[in-house]
A protein has these predicted regions:
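Cysteine protease-like catalytic core of ubiquitin/ubiquitin-like
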Residues: 1-122
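Intrinsically disordered, low-complexity regulatory segments enriched in Ser/Pro/Gln/Gly
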Residues: 122-128
Length: 128
């Protein structure tokens, strides 16, 4: 997506991984939301929703956008796990699990993602 934002407007529920513009990845989703509302799954949340994320979601939804709501989720322990967390949050949404209800097994997240990519299928990430 990024600064060009060359994509189709979404008209149904969606899950999207977005780059914040500051070396960070997050997951957003409208699954189970009131129309126009989008949930933000951010493993490095600091009480501020990045303007770039808001602008990308507005571009995705056009006139139907109302607002973003932060979902309290597990926070990453290092400065380099945001991408794997964004994929894990997305995967849990696909499988209809709520990321705030469990704790991912961080040391096993990257090996799991590598295995999923080799197999060509995303499965639930390991939890503790």
């Amino acid at each position: 997506m990024g600064p060009i934002r060359n994509f189709d407007i979404v008209t149904s529920e969606f899950i999207q991984i977005l780059h914040t513009g500051h070396m960070h990845w997050v997951c957003v989703s409208s699954i189970g939301c009131t129309p126009g509302i989008v949930k933000l799954y951010d493993s490095l949340y600091h009480d501020i929703i990045e303007e770039e994320v808001t602008e990308q979601v507005k571009s995705l939804m056009a006139d139907s956008y109302i607002g973003l709501v932060n979902v309290p989720v597990q926070q990453q322990l290092s400065g380099s796990d945001c991408g794997v967390f964004a994929v894990a949050f997305s995967t849990s949404l696909v499988y209809a699990f709520h990321s705030q209800d469990f704790t991912f097994d961080i040391p096993n997240m990257r090996p799991h993602l590598c295995q999923c990519l080799r197999m060509g299928e995303l499965t639930m990430f390991p939890t503790i």
